[in-house]
Amino acid sequence: MKVLAVTGYKPFELGIFKQDDQALVYIKKAIETRLRSFIDEGLEWILISGQLGTELWAAETAYDLREEYPELKVAVITPFYGQEEKWKEPNKEMYEAVLAQADYEESLTHRPYESPLQFRQKNAFFIEKSDALLLLYDPEMEGSPKYMLQQAEKRRETDGYPIYSITMDDLRAAVEEEDFFT
Protein backbone atom coordinates (compact mmCIF):
# COMPACT_ATOMS: atom_id res chain seq x y z
CA MET A 1 0.00 0.00 0.00
CA LYS A 2 1.42 3.34 -1.06
CA VAL A 3 -1.57 5.70 -0.72
CA LEU A 4 -3.90 5.65 2.30
CA ALA A 5 -7.10 7.70 2.38
CA VAL A 6 -7.97 8.76 5.93
CA THR A 7 -11.28 10.04 7.24
CA GLY A 8 -13.51 9.75 10.27
CA TYR A 9 -15.65 11.66 12.67
CA LYS A 10 -15.76 15.42 12.90
CA PRO A 11 -15.01 16.84 16.37
CA PHE A 12 -18.63 17.55 17.30
CA GLU A 13 -19.59 13.94 16.46
CA LEU A 14 -17.23 12.86 19.26
CA GLY A 15 -18.23 15.60 21.69
CA ILE A 16 -14.89 17.38 21.21
CA PHE A 17 -15.21 21.16 21.21
CA LYS A 18 -11.70 22.30 22.19
CA GLN A 19 -8.38 21.66 20.51
CA ASP A 20 -6.80 20.79 23.85
CA ASP A 21 -9.37 18.12 24.73
CA GLN A 22 -7.64 15.18 26.45
CA ALA A 23 -9.45 12.76 24.13
CA LEU A 24 -7.28 14.00 21.25
CA VAL A 25 -4.20 12.51 22.90
CA TYR A 26 -5.76 9.06 22.65
CA ILE A 27 -7.24 9.57 19.20
CA LYS A 28 -3.88 10.69 17.82
CA LYS A 29 -2.15 7.80 19.59
CA ALA A 30 -4.52 5.32 17.91
CA ILE A 31 -3.93 7.00 14.53
CA GLU A 32 -0.17 6.95 15.11
CA THR A 33 -0.21 3.23 15.92
CA ARG A 34 -2.00 2.46 12.65
CA LEU A 35 0.17 4.80 10.57
CA ARG A 36 3.38 3.30 11.95
CA SER A 37 2.35 -0.19 10.89
CA PHE A 38 1.36 1.04 7.42
CA ILE A 39 4.64 2.96 7.04
CA ASP A 40 6.53 -0.20 7.92
CA GLU A 41 4.64 -1.89 5.07
CA GLY A 42 5.57 0.81 2.53
CA LEU A 43 3.03 3.62 2.99
CA GLU A 44 4.18 6.78 1.20
CA TRP A 45 1.15 9.11 1.03
CA ILE A 46 -1.73 10.02 3.32
CA LEU A 47 -4.70 11.47 1.45
CA ILE A 48 -7.19 13.74 3.26
CA SER A 49 -9.77 16.32 2.23
CA GLY A 50 -8.94 18.71 5.06
CA GLN A 51 -12.18 18.05 6.91
CA LEU A 52 -12.21 19.06 10.58
CA GLY A 53 -11.60 16.25 13.02
CA THR A 54 -10.05 12.93 12.14
CA GLU A 55 -8.55 14.10 8.87
CA LEU A 56 -6.71 17.08 10.34
CA TRP A 57 -5.66 15.03 13.37
CA ALA A 58 -4.25 12.38 11.04
CA ALA A 59 -2.28 15.03 9.14
CA GLU A 60 -0.88 16.47 12.39
CA THR A 61 0.08 12.96 13.48
CA ALA A 62 1.75 12.31 10.11
CA TYR A 63 3.72 15.55 10.43
CA ASP A 64 4.93 14.47 13.87
CA LEU A 65 5.97 11.10 12.43
CA ARG A 66 8.09 12.81 9.77
CA GLU A 67 10.89 13.16 12.30
CA GLU A 68 11.28 9.38 12.09
CA TYR A 69 9.85 8.87 8.61
CA PRO A 70 10.82 11.90 6.48
CA GLU A 71 9.59 10.13 3.34
CA LEU A 72 5.95 10.22 4.55
CA LYS A 73 3.90 12.68 2.52
CA VAL A 74 0.48 14.27 3.00
CA ALA A 75 -1.90 15.33 0.22
CA VAL A 76 -4.85 17.59 0.99
CA ILE A 77 -7.45 17.50 -1.78
CA THR A 78 -10.51 19.52 -0.84
CA PRO A 79 -13.92 18.86 -2.38
CA PHE A 80 -14.32 22.56 -3.26
CA TYR A 81 -12.68 25.95 -2.75
CA GLY A 82 -13.13 27.71 0.57
CA GLN A 83 -14.45 24.83 2.64
CA GLU A 84 -13.06 26.57 5.75
CA GLU A 85 -14.73 29.95 5.14
CA LYS A 86 -17.48 29.51 7.75
CA TRP A 87 -15.33 27.80 10.36
CA LYS A 88 -14.41 29.42 13.67
CA GLU A 89 -11.01 31.09 13.79
CA PRO A 90 -9.17 28.38 15.82
CA ASN A 91 -10.36 25.74 13.32
CA LYS A 92 -9.25 27.89 10.38
CA GLU A 93 -5.82 28.31 11.97
CA MET A 94 -5.46 24.57 12.48
CA TYR A 95 -6.55 23.93 8.88
CA GLU A 96 -4.11 26.50 7.51
CA ALA A 97 -1.28 24.99 9.57
CA VAL A 98 -2.03 21.57 8.07
CA LEU A 99 -2.16 23.02 4.55
CA ALA A 100 1.13 24.86 5.09
CA GLN A 101 2.92 21.57 5.73
CA ALA A 102 1.17 19.53 3.03
CA ASP A 103 3.27 18.07 0.24
CA TYR A 104 0.39 18.46 -2.20
CA GLU A 105 -2.70 20.65 -2.06
CA GLU A 106 -5.51 20.87 -4.59
CA SER A 107 -9.25 21.40 -4.91
CA LEU A 108 -11.05 18.58 -6.66
CA THR A 109 -13.82 20.60 -8.31
CA HIS A 110 -12.01 23.96 -8.63
CA ARG A 111 -15.23 25.73 -7.62
CA PRO A 112 -16.79 26.98 -4.40
CA TYR A 113 -19.47 24.87 -2.72
CA GLU A 114 -22.44 24.24 -4.99
CA SER A 115 -24.08 21.00 -3.86
CA PRO A 116 -23.65 17.75 -1.91
CA LEU A 117 -22.56 16.19 -5.21
CA GLN A 118 -19.10 17.66 -4.56
CA PHE A 119 -18.79 15.52 -1.43
CA ARG A 120 -19.85 12.41 -3.34
CA GLN A 121 -17.30 13.22 -6.05
CA LYS A 122 -14.63 13.63 -3.38
CA ASN A 123 -15.49 10.27 -1.81
CA ALA A 124 -15.39 8.50 -5.19
CA PHE A 125 -12.08 10.15 -6.10
CA PHE A 126 -10.46 9.25 -2.77
CA ILE A 127 -11.47 5.60 -3.00
CA GLU A 128 -10.42 5.37 -6.65
CA LYS A 129 -7.00 6.98 -6.08
CA SER A 130 -6.04 5.25 -2.83
CA ASP A 131 -4.86 1.75 -2.04
CA ALA A 132 -6.77 1.50 1.25
CA LEU A 133 -8.98 3.46 3.63
CA LEU A 134 -8.40 4.14 7.33
CA LEU A 135 -11.33 5.57 9.17
CA LEU A 136 -12.10 6.48 12.74
CA TYR A 137 -15.55 4.99 12.81
CA ASP A 138 -17.69 2.65 14.81
CA PRO A 139 -20.79 1.16 13.15
CA GLU A 140 -22.52 1.40 16.53
CA MET A 141 -22.13 5.21 16.33
CA GLU A 142 -23.21 6.26 12.85
CA GLY A 143 -21.92 9.57 11.53
CA SER A 144 -20.51 11.42 8.55
CA PRO A 145 -17.78 8.83 7.76
CA LYS A 146 -20.47 6.37 6.65
CA TYR A 147 -20.58 7.93 3.17
CA MET A 148 -16.89 7.32 2.48
CA LEU A 149 -17.26 3.85 3.99
CA GLN A 150 -20.15 3.04 1.64
CA GLN A 151 -18.01 4.07 -1.35
CA ALA A 152 -15.12 1.93 -0.07
CA GLU A 153 -17.39 -1.08 0.45
CA LYS A 154 -18.57 -0.84 -3.17
CA ARG A 155 -14.98 -0.97 -4.36
CA ARG A 156 -14.13 -3.77 -1.95
CA GLU A 157 -16.80 -5.93 -3.60
CA THR A 158 -15.01 -5.64 -6.96
CA ASP A 159 -11.31 -5.78 -6.05
CA GLY A 160 -10.93 -6.47 -2.33
CA TYR A 161 -10.10 -2.84 -1.43
CA PRO A 162 -8.80 -2.85 2.17
CA ILE A 163 -10.78 -0.94 4.79
CA TYR A 164 -9.19 -0.40 8.21
CA SER A 165 -11.08 1.04 11.15
CA ILE A 166 -10.15 2.68 14.40
CA THR A 167 -13.09 1.86 16.65
CA MET A 168 -14.14 2.94 20.11
CA ASP A 169 -12.48 -0.26 21.40
CA ASP A 170 -9.19 0.87 19.83
CA LEU A 171 -9.53 4.23 21.56
CA ARG A 172 -10.21 2.53 24.90
CA ALA A 173 -7.06 0.44 24.35
CA ALA A 174 -5.06 3.63 23.69
CA VAL A 175 -6.38 5.11 26.95
CA GLU A 176 -5.50 1.95 28.88
CA GLU A 177 -2.03 1.80 27.34
CA GLU A 178 -1.37 5.45 28.19
CA ASP A 179 -2.65 4.93 31.75
CA PHE A 180 -0.47 1.84 32.11
CA PHE A 181 2.70 3.74 31.24
CA THR A 182 1.96 6.81 33.39
UniProtKB/Swiss-Prot annotation:
**Pfam families (UniProt xref):** YpsA
Q: Which residues form a coiled coil?
A: none
- Tell me its family: Belongs to the UPF0398 family.
The protein, known as: UPF0398 protein RBAM_020340
Organism per entry: Bacillus velezensis (strain DSM 23117 / BGSC 10A6 / LMG 26770 / FZB42)
